[in-house]
Amino acid sequence: MDHLAKTFSACTVTASGLLASAVVALLALAGPAAVAAPAASASATAAASVAPEAGQAAPAFRLQDQTGEWRSLADYRGKWVVLYFYPKDGTPGCTTQACEIRDDIFAFRRANAAVLGVSVDAVNSKKGFAEENNLPFPVLSDTTTTTTKAYGALTSYPQYKLFNISRRDTFIIDPQGRIARRYENVNAEGHSKMVLAELAKLQK
């Protein structure tokens, strides 16, 4: 409980959005320990949003990054791609995850891997998030949720009036554009190193 209290004290929220922002922060930090949606809602989300499996072609996408530049999966053909989905810009868990990737970025580059973050936040939100945390990789805006849904990472928590947000899922995509590894509902802390270790195994 002390840990969660510290988490929420670190979040800046408006009075009108206090409850929703607090819940997003909890979900963003907690990873697999996040509060689960009711079974019926989870089933409905799963039915509408099915993740591609290892060996399948990664769904194509074209999204704007924090600078407004359009990025597509095809741009990275011939490279490994780490495509990670996260719930919301600026929340504690999402910031931790992004900053750990930032600190490991040279290791990803040595592994011939591009890192792309995705959430449903708008481009202006991405810009602030990237600038505040000096992120040296693209964070992409999926406001239509099309890409998040294509990768099976779309979820909702109707009991908290939170709809169509990204779950913390990560996909490693090989240089031929196929899914090599999928992580679902991961812990933010330590995930960057886990992905680097998996990349090393896949590249042997």
Where are the model-predicted features located?
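N-terminal secretory signal peptides that target proteins for export/translocation
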Residues: M1-T12
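Bacterial N-terminal signal peptides
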Residues: T12-A33
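N-proximal helix/coil linker or "cap" segments that precede and/or mark the start of modular domains
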Residues: L27-A28, P32-A60
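A short beta-strand-turn-helix
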Residues: V50-G55, F61-W80
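Short active-site neighborhood of thiol/selenol oxidoreductases, capturing the structured segment around
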Residues: A74-T95
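Structural microenvironment flanking redox-active thiols in thiol-disulfide oxidoreductases
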Residues: G93-T147
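Thiol-/selenol-based redox modules, centered on thioredoxin-like
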Residues: N164-K204
